Amino acid sequence: MKYIVAIIQPDRLEEVLDRLTEKEIHLVTVTNVLGRGRQKGISEVYRSHKEAGSLLRKLKIEIAVNDDYVKQAMEAIVQGARTGKIGDGKIFVLDLHDVLRIRTGETGKNAIG
């Protein structure tokens, strides 16, 4: 089992969710986050004064998948999130040691679905 964490642009969420649904991946958690990468934040002009913000709004998508779905999940995220511009995001894949579905007590692969 793997735990996939993706950081994407907020305006790409619906596209990513559509691509995940096409691949039969439905269990997703989405969180608003702040962060920066190589683009190092943004600069805005407010009342003739240039203000630099070091953190940008992003979305964090978290998905627990069985090993058979890792490649499909990553492909779906890339297809939905990629614009070809700096700031498209990152995908991290982590080992997932165990899962417990609270309602039923199921563990492991059965708890993911």
Report the location of each language-model feature.
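Positively charged, small/polar-rich N-terminal and surface patches that mediate targeting and assembly
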Residues: 1-113
